[in-house]
């Protein structure tokens, strides 16, 4: 029985260990729960709305801690993913197109894309192992 029905795409930003260029790897994760929250934030004496996404990701294979993920050689990244608060993105839904620096910048402007801001690892509990991600 599935608890959640949404798909997300995690975009992991990784600096190539040889060329030092940015590389982007995408992983589609299924059976996630997405909740959207709209908040206000003061900016230059005005109130602006800010969208936050709270995403619950049930345990799925291939996850590595950000530290372990970034130590992997490029040829071992296939099938691996992480949740890093530095430059990683969450796309609501499935995204399978190739990503380069220009596409990454365009993705940042989309309403259905958020930068990972916090991660709560709940995979050591006996029931409902999951990660809770806040993206903005």
State each model region's role.
Residues 22-136:
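Short, conserved turn/kink motifs that form compact alpha/beta structural patches or helix kinks used as
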Residues 1-23, 27-28, 37:
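N-terminal intrinsically disordered, low-complexity, charge/repeat-rich segments that act as generic
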